[in-house]
Amino acid sequence: MLAVAALLVIPAIVVDPKVSAAAPRQMEALTRGVVAVKVSGGVFVSWRLLGGEAANTGFNVYRNGTKVNSSVITTSTNLLDASGSSSSTYYVRAVVNGVERPASNTVSVWANNYKDIPLDKPAGGTTPSGESYTYSANDASVADLDGDGEYEIVLKWDPSNSKDNSQSGYTGNVIFDAYKMNGQKLWRINMGKNIRAGAHYSQFLVYDFDGDGKGEVVIKTADGTVDGIGQVIGSSTADYRNSSGYVLSGPEYLTVFSGQTGAALATTNYVPARGTVSSWGDSYGNRVDRFLAGVAYLDGVRPSIVMSRGYYTRTVIAAFDFRNGSLTSRWTFDTNTSGNSAYAGQGNHSLSVADVDNDGKDEIIFGAMTVDDNGQKLYNTNMGHGDAMHVSDLNPNRAGFEVFKVNEDTSKPYGAQVHDAATGQILWGVYTGTDTGRGMAADIDPRYPGAEVWAGSGVGLRTITGQLISSTPPSSQNFGIWWDGDLLRELLDHVWSGSAGVGVGKIEKWNYNTGAVSRLLTATGTYSNNSTKGTPSLQADLIGDWREEVLWRTEDSTKLRLYTTTDVTAYRLYTLMHDAVYRLAVAWQNVAYNQPPHTSYFLGDGMSTPPAPSMYTTLPQASFTEVGTANALLAEQAALEEAAAAPEQEPAPQTGLETDPQPEPETTPAPEQLPDNSVPTGPVDPSAAAQAAPGAAMRALLGQAAPIL
């Protein structure tokens, strides 16, 4: 074991932060997401605070139609109902300025802290070489695919003979399914024989790209791909596989599929094109097929598609828009372009997306380099390729985002480093002299401000400013998850069995006093994904309050198991899925070497009150009550405040809001023109909210305990 390596701190460069020009962003319209779980002391109930709601929105909780709470709940979005039972049903009503809003969907009580989602497991097959294979559930992503305000799941099925790019051999076809949370299958897409199976081949994006309120699915396709309604893309008979199982010839496409039906909506040639295989770093098919993908708000308002090829040598990143049924190119960044050659070989096995320069538009953090929203180079740290990276406001005591990255190249001065996400300035680093394969960033120790970072290879556990806490870091360097009742992040990993070749999901808590972990959850009956990497199918804030859920496959892959926390928390935050950075991180989580999502603000011990999401939703044909509610809140709040400021006028009428599921408030266009069917749901004026309920936001974060009733 290497000794803890020396810390190198680089003198700071003072950069004046820009004033953000952020416009409201198109985001998903979600329901309240109520979940109720039977626990030993009654029933745990939690729900969402939506991004379009005022910070002082209150809530009433109803069991079997009778209100549970004695006073409006304003400091949390969860409670323990001591009188609840397994046969109870629950719904939640928002309370705005003393007026109770329409009810959420009514939910039944889960018997356990998980819910099984049935799957339609595909039958296995046989390759041209005679090898048999079976399927297991693999990576997943979510979006509201049908416009009902609830998340649906898009799941990748991985054949048992899937390959790393460095491995030769045929593979079974990659298959994608879409499911509702009750297990209803919406469609199946078969990628066909000309798409190889493996972690680096089929990166899939699930997001509402055209703003119709329903998510699309974007994947690289080829001749023989069959969409969700049985239509074949390109030739149904072409077979471009060579004798080693690689696909190094034939057309490549980029296809947008309907999230609701799986039908191919638009297909274009894939950019970046394959070209000459050897121009990507080898001639046998390894480096040419290293793909990444992400979603980015390149105009600051609407989401764009980002696809890439290559990161060991040549790198090409291409951005597309899907609008009005058409795919159009936005820009292409190529390290072969004059002036970009220094950016070659700087990519990671994953990417991140955030507005790092605070101009309201997203950048692509592509490992050691970052590309600006306009497709031009922003900076390059020259630290080269790496396997793990974390981007967030990791240090709340300095302006902007930080990047914690581990590096593979043993010739580089740092095996792990933290750099300024806006400028690329390396703030500090640790020399390791070896491939530092994994690294994590999360707030796991409240004794030090900001996140802690850790890695192997002698890096140790360190503060975000580089101070060594312990030469023995947590052994888990996988995922972090907000799970229990405090603001620290827990560790999500797996119990790996080398003999069985599988891992069982687990969540643990780091004890910063003893330097050990305690087990919070063993997901018995589940398996992790992607071999020793031990990643879940998905980790995200899918239901309930702001804390995260996790999806693991069951041992036989006939179900996905959705776990949720049942710990009462006194902290109240907007749903993480309405945070700009977090939602995009969920979209790219499945890409190559999966990484955990982070927020746009520091979420941890000692945090400040985070800003309310600046967002709007598109609701052409909303079919659920709460969409109207969520989008009426801002208009109602503004009307009441205007009336209060002008007492000689009659107060704004409130009739109809209780019974009308889709009120039509006045709309205000964003600084850049919004779609005609857009409805803004940005935050209320903070000063107005404070006058309405002094100290409500800070109390909600740091003050009173959640009710136990």
Where do the language-model regions lie?
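C-terminal segment of classical bacterial N-terminal signal peptides
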Residues: 9-19
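Beta-propeller-forming repeat regions
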Residues: 24-33, 42, 49-54, 74-76, ...
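Short amphipathic beta-strand segments in non-cytosolic proteins
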Residues: 63-67
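Sec-dependent N-terminal signal peptides
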Residues: 1-7
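Composition-driven, intrinsically disordered low-complexity tracts enriched in small residues
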Residues: 19-22, 629-709
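Short beta-strand elements bearing conserved aromatic residues within extracellular beta-rich modules
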Residues: 58-61
